[in-house]
Swiss-Prot record:
GO terms for molecular function: ion channel inhibitor activity; toxin activity. Expressed by the venom duct. Keywords: Amidation, Disulfide bond, Hydroxylation, Neurotoxin, Pyrrolidone carboxylic acid, Secreted, Signal, Toxin. One of its GO terms (cellular component) is extracellular region. It is found in: Secreted. This is Conotoxin VnMMSK-02. InterPro entries: Conotoxin.
């Protein structure tokens, strides 16, 4: 019984692989260019202190943190 289920599963996966499923169009992985534009680097963060090379204040989106 188990070998029949295994054979059926193998045949189904060969005929319809999981990679054939369409991905959702609004996933960030589908649009790496937009994801890169939305990403703000630490040097461009408004709390980044260029002299000390760290972030002052809140360290939620900025790294390294001055502490």
């Amino acid at each position: 019984m188990m070998s029949k289920l295994g054979a059926l599963l193998t045949i189904c996966l060969l005929l319809f692989p999981l990679t054939a499923l369409p991905l959702d169009g609004d996933q960030p992985a589908d649009r790496p260019a937009e994801r890169m534009q939305d990403d703000i680097s630490s040097e461009q963060h408004p709390l980044f202190d260029k002299e000390r090379q760290c972030c002052t204040g809140s360290c939620l989106n900025c790294w390294p943190c001055c502490g």
